[in-house]
Amino acid sequence: MKKTDTENQFLIDDIDKQIMALLKDDARASLKSLASYTYLSSTAVSARIEKLEKAGDIQGYYTRINPENFGLSVRAFINLDLEPIQKKDFYPYVRSCPNVVACNCVTGDYSMLLEVLFASTFELDKFINELQHFGKTKTQIVFSTPVEHRDVLPKDRS
Protein backbone atom coordinates (compact mmCIF):
# COMPACT_ATOMS: atom_id res chain seq x y z
CA MET A 1 0.00 0.00 0.00
CA LYS A 2 1.79 3.15 -1.21
CA LYS A 3 1.04 6.67 -0.03
CA THR A 4 -0.30 9.04 -2.70
CA ASP A 5 -0.08 12.83 -2.85
CA THR A 6 -3.37 13.34 -1.03
CA GLU A 7 -3.20 12.95 2.75
CA ASN A 8 -4.90 9.76 3.98
CA GLN A 9 -5.24 8.46 0.41
CA PHE A 10 -3.43 5.25 -0.48
CA LEU A 11 -2.99 3.49 -3.77
CA ILE A 12 -4.85 0.23 -3.68
CA ASP A 13 -2.73 -2.71 -4.80
CA ASP A 14 -3.78 -6.21 -5.82
CA ILE A 15 -3.48 -7.51 -2.26
CA ASP A 16 -5.81 -4.77 -0.97
CA LYS A 17 -8.28 -5.67 -3.71
CA GLN A 18 -8.02 -9.33 -2.74
CA ILE A 19 -8.66 -8.50 0.92
CA MET A 20 -11.70 -6.37 -0.01
CA ALA A 21 -13.04 -9.12 -2.28
CA LEU A 22 -12.68 -11.70 0.48
CA LEU A 23 -14.39 -9.40 3.01
CA LYS A 24 -17.14 -8.59 0.49
CA ASP A 25 -17.92 -12.30 0.24
CA ASP A 26 -17.54 -12.94 3.98
CA ALA A 27 -17.38 -9.91 6.27
CA ARG A 28 -16.82 -12.27 9.20
CA ALA A 29 -13.65 -13.80 7.75
CA SER A 30 -10.92 -14.09 10.37
CA LEU A 31 -7.56 -12.37 10.04
CA LYS A 32 -5.98 -15.83 9.99
CA SER A 33 -8.16 -16.87 7.05
CA LEU A 34 -7.47 -13.64 5.15
CA ALA A 35 -3.75 -14.04 5.85
CA SER A 36 -3.72 -17.57 4.41
CA TYR A 37 -5.38 -16.38 1.17
CA THR A 38 -3.07 -13.38 0.75
CA TYR A 39 0.15 -15.02 1.96
CA LEU A 40 0.62 -12.24 4.52
CA SER A 41 0.81 -12.35 8.29
CA SER A 42 -2.34 -11.65 10.30
CA THR A 43 -0.66 -8.46 11.54
CA ALA A 44 -0.01 -7.26 7.98
CA VAL A 45 -3.61 -8.01 6.96
CA SER A 46 -4.90 -6.17 10.02
CA ALA A 47 -2.75 -3.13 9.18
CA ARG A 48 -4.01 -3.08 5.59
CA ILE A 49 -7.64 -3.35 6.71
CA GLU A 50 -7.13 -0.52 9.19
CA LYS A 51 -5.62 1.69 6.46
CA LEU A 52 -8.50 0.85 4.08
CA GLU A 53 -10.99 1.75 6.82
CA LYS A 54 -9.23 5.04 7.64
CA ALA A 55 -9.13 5.96 3.94
CA GLY A 56 -12.89 5.32 3.73
CA ASP A 57 -12.50 2.48 1.24
CA ILE A 58 -14.07 0.04 3.71
CA GLN A 59 -17.06 1.79 5.25
CA GLY A 60 -18.54 -0.99 7.32
CA TYR A 61 -19.39 -4.64 7.70
CA TYR A 62 -22.93 -5.81 7.10
CA THR A 63 -25.25 -8.70 7.72
CA ARG A 64 -27.65 -9.47 4.88
CA ILE A 65 -31.08 -10.21 6.27
CA ASN A 66 -33.74 -11.94 4.17
CA PRO A 67 -36.77 -9.60 4.36
CA GLU A 68 -39.14 -12.35 3.19
CA ASN A 69 -38.37 -14.33 6.35
CA PHE A 70 -39.91 -11.42 8.26
CA GLY A 71 -43.01 -11.11 6.09
CA LEU A 72 -41.70 -8.30 3.87
CA SER A 73 -42.35 -9.87 0.47
CA VAL A 74 -43.50 -6.80 -1.50
CA ARG A 75 -40.55 -4.81 -2.86
CA ALA A 76 -41.28 -1.68 -4.86
CA PHE A 77 -39.58 1.34 -6.37
CA ILE A 78 -41.43 4.61 -6.02
CA ASN A 79 -40.66 7.69 -8.08
CA LEU A 80 -41.64 10.92 -6.33
CA ASP A 81 -41.83 14.38 -7.88
CA LEU A 82 -40.63 16.57 -5.01
CA GLU A 83 -40.12 20.32 -5.14
CA PRO A 84 -36.69 21.43 -3.83
CA ILE A 85 -38.30 23.52 -1.08
CA GLN A 86 -39.99 20.35 0.30
CA LYS A 87 -36.68 18.53 0.92
CA LYS A 88 -36.26 19.99 4.43
CA ASP A 89 -39.56 18.36 5.47
CA PHE A 90 -39.30 15.26 3.29
CA TYR A 91 -35.83 14.05 4.32
CA PRO A 92 -36.61 13.73 8.05
CA TYR A 93 -39.93 12.08 7.19
CA VAL A 94 -38.44 9.47 4.85
CA ARG A 95 -35.55 8.74 7.25
CA SER A 96 -38.14 7.88 9.91
CA CYS A 97 -39.92 5.33 7.68
CA PRO A 98 -38.60 1.85 8.55
CA ASN A 99 -39.91 0.33 5.30
CA VAL A 100 -37.77 2.64 3.15
CA VAL A 101 -34.66 0.68 2.19
CA ALA A 102 -33.11 3.48 0.11
CA CYS A 103 -33.95 6.98 -1.02
CA ASN A 104 -32.06 8.59 -3.88
CA CYS A 105 -32.22 12.10 -5.34
CA VAL A 106 -32.26 11.52 -9.12
CA THR A 107 -32.52 13.29 -12.47
CA GLY A 108 -35.39 12.92 -14.91
CA ASP A 109 -39.15 13.33 -14.66
CA TYR A 110 -39.10 12.57 -10.93
CA SER A 111 -36.70 13.92 -8.32
CA MET A 112 -36.64 11.05 -5.80
CA LEU A 113 -36.43 7.28 -6.16
CA LEU A 114 -37.36 5.20 -3.12
CA GLU A 115 -36.91 1.49 -2.62
CA VAL A 116 -39.38 0.07 -0.10
CA LEU A 117 -40.34 -3.26 1.47
CA PHE A 118 -43.82 -4.09 2.75
CA ALA A 119 -45.77 -7.14 3.88
CA SER A 120 -48.67 -6.45 1.51
CA THR A 121 -49.78 -4.27 -1.36
CA PHE A 122 -52.36 -2.83 1.04
CA GLU A 123 -49.56 -1.48 3.29
CA LEU A 124 -47.67 -0.25 0.22
CA ASP A 125 -50.77 1.60 -0.97
CA LYS A 126 -51.16 3.31 2.43
CA PHE A 127 -47.53 4.46 2.28
CA ILE A 128 -47.94 5.76 -1.28
CA ASN A 129 -50.99 7.76 -0.15
CA GLU A 130 -48.83 9.36 2.58
CA LEU A 131 -46.07 10.11 0.06
CA GLN A 132 -48.52 11.87 -2.24
CA HIS A 133 -48.68 14.71 0.29
CA PHE A 134 -45.21 15.59 -1.01
CA GLY A 135 -45.92 15.18 -4.73
CA LYS A 136 -46.88 12.95 -7.63
CA THR A 137 -45.74 9.31 -7.47
CA LYS A 138 -45.17 6.46 -9.89
CA THR A 139 -44.71 2.97 -8.46
CA GLN A 140 -43.17 -0.21 -9.83
CA ILE A 141 -43.60 -3.46 -7.91
CA VAL A 142 -40.73 -5.94 -8.24
CA PHE A 143 -41.59 -9.43 -9.51
CA SER A 144 -38.08 -10.86 -9.16
CA THR A 145 -34.50 -9.77 -8.51
CA PRO A 146 -32.06 -11.68 -10.74
CA VAL A 147 -29.12 -9.64 -9.37
CA GLU A 148 -29.17 -8.69 -5.68
CA HIS A 149 -27.49 -5.53 -4.40
CA ARG A 150 -23.75 -5.96 -4.46
CA ASP A 151 -20.72 -3.84 -3.82
CA VAL A 152 -18.47 -3.10 -6.75
CA LEU A 153 -14.77 -3.53 -6.17
CA PRO A 154 -12.46 -0.78 -7.44
CA LYS A 155 -10.16 -1.28 -10.40
CA ASP A 156 -7.82 1.53 -9.40
CA ARG A 157 -8.04 4.81 -7.57
CA SER A 158 -7.74 7.70 -10.02
Residue ranges and their predicted role:
Residues 1-158:
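A compositional/biophysical signature of low hydrophobicity enriched in polar/charged and small residues
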